[in-house]
Amino acid sequence: EDGSDPASGDFLAEGGGVR
């Protein structure tokens, strides 16, 4: 994912999680 949400998205992306 793009990491636009704190709980979903790439953990390397800004504000991203590790879901």
From Swiss-Prot:
GO terms for cellular component: extracellular region. Signal peptide: none annotated. It is found in: Secreted. Conversion of fibrinogen to fibrin is triggered by thrombin, which cleaves fibrinopeptides A and B from alpha and beta chains, and thus exposes the N-terminal polymerization sites responsible for the formation of the soft clot. The soft clot is converted into the hard clot by factor XIIIA which catalyzes the epsilon-(gamma-glutamyl)lysine cross-linking between gamma chains (stronger) and between alpha chains (weaker) of different monomers. Keywords: Adaptive immunity, Blood coagulation, Coiled coil, Disulfide bond, Hemostasis, Immunity, Innate immunity, Secreted. GO terms for biological process: adaptive immune response; blood coagulation; innate immune response. Heterohexamer; disulfide linked. Contains 2 sets of 3 non-identical chains (alpha, beta and gamma). The 2 heterotrimers are in head to head conformation with the N-termini in a small central domain. A long coiled coil structure formed by 3 polypeptide chains connects the central nodule to the C-terminal domains (distal nodules). The long C-terminal ends of the alpha chains fold back, contributing a fourth strand to the coiled coil structure. Cleaved by the protease thrombin to yield monomers which, together with fibrinogen beta (FGB) and fibrinogen gamma (FGG), polymerize to form an insoluble fibrin matrix. Fibrin has a major function in hemostasis as one of the primary components of blood clots. In addition, functions during the early stages of wound repair to stabilize the lesion and guide cell migration during re-epithelialization. Was originally thought to be essential for platelet aggregation, based on in vitro studies using anticoagulated blood. This is Fibrinogen alpha chain. It comes from Bison bonasus (European bison). The gene is FGA.
